[in-house]
Regions:
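Jelly-roll (double-stranded beta-helix
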Residues: 1-287
Length: 287
């Protein structure tokens, strides 16, 4: 389930996803993600990963805009970045110390009525607890929320164009999360920086445009979302390839999700659809 959310007020309830991990990308704003295991201060361009079954709430300090992916299982670091012992390899695009764990606060010793909304299998239940969910004196283990900032991602570059899968950042059952980060372009003397036309027959492609200039797209601005369904041929719009020649770098930041099961569009999305988007591939006549 992929959506966007805007948080302007502290959450008055606690939320627990019992169906899988949640991945929240912070487009704008700052604040604190609270959980029984402690607090994580977040800022713009943070990925917040909340494991399945962990209750949390957001306490924004400023208006917080989110791109949200509710997964059907665990969000993991791709296996190709890990050695047999789980340590990150040297070619991974980040380091263990780039991930921020919760800071355990003092136990919240309070009784009353505390609403916990639990989501699982397409349904939501409400539990009212007598004791505060954050009344925790300590914890142990490896299942806890983490934060990672996209600005700490070290993108892979190459002599020739790198396919999108090169820029994978996380994986989950049926999905690959990709980050198009600011980077140098291909450095072969005759390289064409713009991506080639392609049809991804195995997945639907979602891209959320966070910041910068995404060179292969026209009519895209910050917070735009595109969906290219499996099998639909797409690529640079007319003029984008020519405009990319000679470029040495990009400042784009875009969060992408490759979904390996067909996506169904929710009814509210149609009200904000750019019905003319497909026409952006029509060449503009010069007079």
């Amino acid at each position: 389930l992929i959506s966007t959310a805007t948080v302007t007020q502290p959450m008055e309830y606690f939320f627990r996803n019992a169906g899988g991990d949640e991945l929240l990308f912070v487009q704008a704003g700052d604040g604190v993600l609270e959980s029984p295991l402690g607090d994580i201060a977040y800022r713009a361009h943070d990925y917040l990963i909340v494991p399945c079954g962990i209750a949390y709430r957001l306490q924004p300090r400023s208006k917080t805009e989110l791109f949200v992916a509710e997964c059907s299982g665990t969000v993991e670091i791709p296996e190709k970045f890990r050695n047999p012992f789980g340590q990150l390899k040297e070619h991974a695009p980040y380091y263990e110390r780039d991930f921020r764990a919760p800071d355990l606060r003092e136990p919240h010793d309070e009784q009353g009525e505390f609403e916990v909304r639990i989501s699982a299998r397409g349904r939501t239940a409400i539990h009212v607890m007598q004791n505060h969910p954050f009344d925790v004196v300590g914890w142990d283990g490896y299942c806890y929320p983490v934060a990672f900032n996209a600005d700490d991602y070290a993108p892979v570059t190459g002599k020739l164009h790198q396919p999108p899968s090169t820029h994978v950042i996380f994986e989950a059952p049926g999905a690959a999360f990709i980050l198009f980060a600011p980077r140098h372009f291909d450095y072969h003397p005759q390289a064409v920086p713009a991506p080639y036309n392609h049809a991804s027959v195995d997945c639907d492609e979602i891209i959320y445009y966070a910041s910068g200039n995404f060179m292969s797209r026209r009519g895209i601005e910050e917070r735009s979302i595109t969906l290219h369904a499996a099998g639909a041929v797409h690529g640079p719009q007319p003029g984008a390839v020519e405009a990319s020649l000679g470029k040495t770098a990009t400042d784009e930041l875009a969060v992408a999700v490759d979904c390996f099961a067909p996506l169904r569009i929710a009814e509210p999305a149609f009200s904000i659809e750019d019905a003319g988007y497909f026409r952006s591939w029509v060449a503009v006549s010069k007079t």
